[in-house]
Amino acid sequence: ALPVAVLGAGPVGLAAAAQLIERGIPFVIVEAAATVGANLLDYGHVRLFSPWRYDIDPAMARLLQPTGWQAPSADELPLAGEVVQRVLEPFAQLPQVASVLQLSTKVIAVTRQGFDKVKSAGRENAPFVIRAVRGGRTFELKARAVIDSTGTWNTPNPVGASGLPAIGEPELADRIFYGIPDVLGAHRSRYAGQRTLVVGAGHSAANALLALAELAGQAPGTRLLWSVRSPVLTRVFGGGDADALPARGALGSSLRSLRDSGGLTFQ
């Protein structure tokens, strides 16, 4: 039987693999990066607002337990990098995972065998064909089903409106950081004493703004500007003390206080 193809070896992809193992379903994992959890490592310095109890798939935990793996404290808030180090990497080393894990393999197309773009009758019964590139070599593999867990981290929303880059944005790419920079660590020199514009109203923006505010207290001349598309900030401010995840509520409350105190220029 053809395997299920899991695209992406992050927390979702590896959780899917764990579920497939417990159900006895053959699978293969295809990951573009050279390591599992690569997207989490991009913001490995950020503390998550979801505690460990929500960050580990139960099937993964069950498969890890016979190896002597120690589960983290359920109520502890991990750094993103710790999720990789303490869960994803040990899971990826299990023989039943390591034997089917293809790292440094970028998927460039997914289609159905024998069907082009204008044929549809019977398409749902045909195997999937996955075209990928590894080490400069292009190859194909077949699958009975595909689980796309690649995420959107590597395709960030551009600064401009309507899903388009702002005019001049591509030319200034070296001045723009998409994601959550390590403002107080590896990227400190880039932002200390500078005026920085943060665009967005999600939790990535909230983390960046609060880190920049802390940096401003340490490095004179550091200034913050915050720009959003919508004046409705309910999502990023969260539920405060009533938030189902207390750390998420605290993050939003801290950002609200920063804005209200005049610690940044809001527009």
Sequence positions of predicted segments:
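N-terminal Rossmann-like FAD-binding beta1-loop-alpha1 element of flavoenzymes
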Residues: 2-29, 198, 202-215
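A Rossmann-like FAD-binding core segment of flavoenzymes
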Residues: 109, 216-267
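Conserved acidic residues
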Residues: 3, 144, 194
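Glycine-rich dinucleotide-binding loop and its adjacent helix/turn
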Residues: 148-218, 224
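Glycine-rich active-site loop/strand segments that organize a redox cofactor
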Residues: 34-87, 181-185, 224-248
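Feature captures the FAD/FMN-dependent oxidoreductase FAD-binding
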Residues: 70-155
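Conserved Rossmann-like nucleotide-cofactor binding loop
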Residues: 12, 35, 153, 204, ...
